[in-house]
Regions:
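A short core secondary-structure module
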Residues: 155, 161-198
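Glycine-rich beta->alpha junctions and the first turn(s) of the following alpha-helix
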Residues: 10-24, 89, 197-236
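Internal helix-loop-helix
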Residues: 8, 59-125, 167-171
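Buried hydrophobic positions in well-ordered alpha/beta secondary-structure cores of metabolic enzymes
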Residues: 19, 30, 61, 68, ...
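A short, Trp-centered hydrophobic/proline-enriched beta-strand micro-motif
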Residues: 125-135
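A structural signal for short hydrophobic beta-strand segments in well-ordered beta-sheet cores
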Residues: 147-150
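Generic N-terminal amphipathic, Lys/Arg-enriched alpha-helix
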Residues: 2-13, 33-39
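Short secondary-structure junction/hinge motifs that connect adjacent elements
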Residues: 37-59
Length: 236
């Protein structure tokens, strides 16, 4: 027997005062900064975004919304980020915003205290970052991560390929899921450690976005273990 839900019986979903204000501000900003002609012009650019607009976004404090004030952020929640992302999508304003916000959350949940103090203030003020978690099998199960990290002494050497990595050319670092000793870990990979031939642009449906395959073979942390986040947060 089918069960029907009366919409009138469903609880109303409202916006907080902060969310309502952010919608208005974000709508105005995105509308002004991303007219159709600007969107079309950026389709021909390698990066696909305007760095001056990115700097303005950082100055507005949007990158620090989901970061606690302890680490240089504003200390609100992801619910306050949603209105901004919604307006960016509506007006096709392409930036590394989502990639950087998600990378910040990965550090916040999986990093050591030293890593949080080092990285999060930078992300809150305009340093871009990204995530590398997709692999060719398309499986989201962390137990099936095929990218590996081999430990020799205090040195971690990576292998494997990540796909659909957003905004890697603009990112200062990528946080990737890697299996180390059969345990899923988050590994921080500075993008300046990636040779140009390790990054290949992929074709995707949305031409306003940039996504890449990133080959990790031979990438090493040079003994600087700070690049390795606390892996137990990803253990299944």
């Amino acid at each position: 027997m089918s069960t029907f839900i009366n919409p009138a019986q469903m609880p109303a979903i409202g916006l907080s005062e902060e969310q309502a204000q952010l919608i208005d501000i974000a709508a105005s900003f995105c509308r002004d900064k991303s007219p159709v002609d600007a969107v079309r012009a950026l389709l021909e650019e390698d990066t696909g975004f305007n760095p001056d607009i990115w700097q303005e976004i950082a100055e507005l404090g949007w990158l620090g919304i989901g970061i606690p004030d302890t680490y240089g952020g504003i200390g609100l929640g992801l619910g306050e980020i949603v209105p901004i992302v919604e307006q960016m999508g509506r007006h096709l304003l392409t930036t590394p915003f989502v990639s950087t916000v998600l990378a910040a959350q990965a550090v916040l949940r999986g990093g050591t205290e030293a890593q949080k103090n080092e990285i999060l203030p930078k992300l809150a003020t305009g340093t871009a970052a990204t995530l590398g978690f997709c692999e060719d099998h398309g499986d989201w199960n962390l137990a099936h991560v095929t990218c590996k990290g081999s430990v020799a002494g205090d040195k971690l050497t990576l292998s494997g390929t990540k796909y659909l990595v957003s905004d890697v050319l603009q990112a200062a670092f990528m946080i990737a899921t890697v299996a180390v000793n059969d345990q899923a870990n988050l590994v921080i990979i500075p993008t300046d450690a990636l040779p140009p031939e390790a990054i290949r642009r992929e074709k995707i449906i949305d031409e306003t976005r940039r996504a890449y395959a990133v080959v990790l073979d031979g990438i090493s942390d040079g003994g600087r273990r700070r690049r390795k986040c606390a892996g137990e947060t990803l253990k299944q």
